[in-house]
Amino acid sequence: MHTSHVLPRAALPVALGLLLASGHAGAQSNPSVATAPAPLSPAELSALVQQQALQIQQLEARLRAVEGGAVPLASAPAAATSAAPAALEQRVVAVEKAQSKAPKVSWSKGAPEFTSADGETVFRPRGRLFVDQSSTSGSDYGTRNLSGTEIRSVRLGAEGRYGIIGYAVEGDFADNAVAWKSVYATVDHTLFGQAADLTIGNRLNDRGLDGSSSTSNTPFQDRNVVGTLVMPQRGLFGVGLTERVYGKGWHASLSVAGNDLNNSGSDNDSLTWATRVHWNPVLSKDATVHLAAWAFHEEIPGGATGVLRSSAISGHFNDEIKIAPGTLVGTDRSNAWGVEAAGFFGPFWTSGEWGTRNLRGLDANGRYDLDHDAWSVGAGWFVAGAVPAYTAKAGTWGKVKVAEPVTSGGKGAFELKARYEDVDYAELPTGGTGNAWTLGGNWYLNDYSRVMLDVVRWKTDNRSGAYVGPDEGTTFNTRLQLVF
């Protein structure tokens, strides 16, 4: 409270002494000067002293800032203010020059991000933790009415950059196993005058709004059925090359990849060509419209597993509640495509996706040509504290920014959400059908953590597996999520 008074008082006698001494020395060293400068009036002298004191005070504050000092000016010895402004300026410049060469550290993403002084080298650890609880009731099969907890995902890794070369390495501990996820390098460049990057390695598919987004950012605990079922035999990831080009409100990608990094190496890889394009016809602070389409073609080796996938329609924990696709042997290729639409209007969002996959192969009955499809629609409303997060660069869900985090004394952000999704395997020889309504809410504690509730009302009608025929029930899923 007294900082602004101590320095002027300390500087006053110093400045007066310097002025008088310089005036006296000047008079003695220049006796031949006919006209001496007019003496300063008391008011002018006082103004000059105050100006000098203010300059010293500003330099001291600047020096404390760059040195990180915390000693209040009032507690410092008065003699510390007697240094001449020029000497103090030199000291500040020297400290600032040394500090400019030191690496910078930012915590804006929840973990320390280290950046070299020239900005060319960046490194930060990254990871996530999903702790889930699930409870199901209402099924006609008692073995489907399960309750329990699981650590859905513990993911640890790092990402960084050396100039135009970026990288990410990440492993996931889930389902009592360890699996590699993102393991790739990128090279930034330009293509047709637009920003672009080439990915080499194991990276998440660019396929659908939910399918292209991390589950750390999707509004629901699990991706919709288009993202989880209408996919290549290799799954969500694949080792290969992906070229992406970015424009204002659009992007396009083309990739070619084999199986993901966790392939056992005991058989041939599948080979998948894929593309996706998104466009934002409306892109502003108050409203954004997302339109997109995607497609892939894959060549599947003989004896490959995982060509068809069961839909965990009630959430990840309960493995008994799935829509069974049945058995299909001899598939040697597939083609798939889908469309997306979404809108973000202030605190509201809505989205819809549809996808279909055509399977071709040879079984005991000869050649076949069969389809299966899925679709989903959803909507949400941020009641308070934030707005929907969307990344226009890649056409994906983004990370929600909380205005008043709980960790800073605020209330966080609250979101209400609803989704309907439908799966149809009926054209396959023994494929089932099913659908689900999901209602819930998310409480965002800060930019890095949230508590989620999904209440799923599901129906299945399987023609194969342990639970044949119509069945329905309700599943309550909760999650504590931490991502950095």
Feature roles, as predicted:
Residues 2-12:
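Bacterial N-terminal signal peptides that target proteins for export
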Residues 2-4, 40, 142, 187, ...:
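Outer-membrane beta-barrel pore domains
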Residues 11-21:
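Bacterial N-terminal signal peptides
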Residues 25-128, 383, 387-401:
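N-terminal periplasmic/intermembrane-space "pro-region" immediately following the signal or transit peptide
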Residues 29-32, 78-86, 157-174, 240-267, ...:
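Glycine/serine-rich loop-strand microenvironments at binding/catalytic pocket rims
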Residues 44, 60, 67, 89, ...:
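Acidic-residue sensor for enzyme active/binding pockets
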Residues 107-301, 372, 376-408, 415-417, ...:
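Outer membrane beta-barrel
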